Structures are given as structure tokens and as C-alpha cells.
A protein has these predicted regions:
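N-terminal leader/linker segments that precede catalytic domains of diphosphate-processing enzymes
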Residues: 1-131
Length: 131
């Protein structure tokens, strides 16, 4: 039997964005482009890979890099501003070793600080607030 190679998990961050809606608290989800090979067409929270720049010359600050990534992804994918200090670390998990693509993801939750919501049209096709 051939031994299967385990793919290294890429560091990533996701942000669960909240706002006060007319009928109560709402959460933002974006529909991933159907052209993407990883969960194309799925409704997801904004997020993505942690870039080297997210470490801001602090290679040992994994949580800080993840926060900066979450803020950046909210802006890139949804046009929304997020205060990194208002984010709460919700959870972290890593995709199982059997998956062909793996991520070690930091999950944050926090309020939207401003901006105009707009799907980027590349990774995210649509945005919707859910209650």
C-alpha cells in the first residue's frame, strides 16, 4: 500500500463579523466564487491565508498576525473595517490530515467598525447578513 503524504497546514484566519440589525444581531457571510477549487460556491465567513506581511516584523506573534490577517481579509473580501483590538479569539482548528488542502485557522469574532459592504467579485461573489 502506498504511503500518503500529509500536506502541511497553511496558517489562516477567519472573522465572524457582527452588527446590530433591525431585528437583532446579524452575522455576515460571503458566497465564495464558484470558480474557486476550495469550497467554491459555499457561504463562509471572511478569511484567508496569513501573509508574511501580517507578522509585521514579529515572527513569534502568531495571534497578532492572525488578527491582522482577519482585519485585512474583511476589508479585501467585504469592504468592511474591523478594529483588531475589538476581535475576540473564538477558536482555532486545523484541517484533518486526510484533506488534500489543509489550514491551521484562527477564528475571531467581533463587530464591524465601518466601511461599505461590497463583495470583491473575485473570491467573494455575494455578501449577506443573516440573523
Amino acid at each position: 500500500m502506498e504511503e500518503r503524504r500529509v500536506v502541511e497546514a497553511a496558517p489562516a484566519a477567519t472573522v465572524v463579523l457582527l452588527r446590530d440589525g433591525e431585528a437583532g444581531i446579524e452575522v455576515l457571510l460571503g458566497r465564495r466564487s464558484s470558480r474557486l477549487d476550495f469550497h467554491g460556491g459555499a457561504w463562509v465567513f471572511p478569511g484567508g491565508r496569513i501573509d508574511p506581511e501580517d507578522y509585521a516584523d514579529r515572527p513569534d506573534d502568531a495571534e497578532g498576525a492572525a488578527r491582522r490577517c482577519a482585519v485585512r481579509e474583511a476589508k479585501e473580501e467585504a469592504g468592511l473595517d474591523v478594529d483588531p483590538d475589538a476581535l475576540v479569539h473564538l477558536s482555532s482548528w486545523t484541517t484533518p490530515e486526510i484533506a488534500p488542502k489543509r489550514f491551521a485557522t484562527w477564528f475571531f469574532i467581533g463587530p464591524v467598525a465601518g466601511g461599505v459592504e461590497e463583495a470583491d467579485g473575485t473570491e467573494t461573489e455575494a455578501l449577506r447578513w443573516f440573523r
